[in-house]
């Protein structure tokens, strides 16, 4: 049995240099058309190829083009999705985080599942941070909840009241530094909801 590849680490995300000006981060979902298709993301009128099929498991790739646009991509350990961030060197354009994948077409309707991965984010006190995440999903009840934890296991973020509709989901995102709760949304990717990805936002 092959050894499962390691996931990208918090340190690797920091080294990739993700940092965006406070208050300008937006978040979006994009999709790949089919299993094995090219993963692309639209940013400021540009189509970015974030497929990166030859990157090694457990790594995060950061690349900057001639215009100073930097793209940070993780998800090399996943078969049906990618996630990351894109920002300009001079911060003239808004920074964005993204989740891209092959949407699930055969959603489970019974049972439950637990997903573990990473959250990449930016905030007033947590520029270019990544956290470990865990989501508990009930396909029978069409609900999900989750947490975002530091390396030592301290809970920092909470995803609650998540509702599943088709292959998509949405709910309440709670951040201790935010004045009010925000929102999170996402999709399941791959056959039988093999993976999930999405974004969250809360105002400081």
Question: Which ranges hold each PLM region?
Answer:
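Mature soluble binding/inhibitory domains
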Residues: 1-204
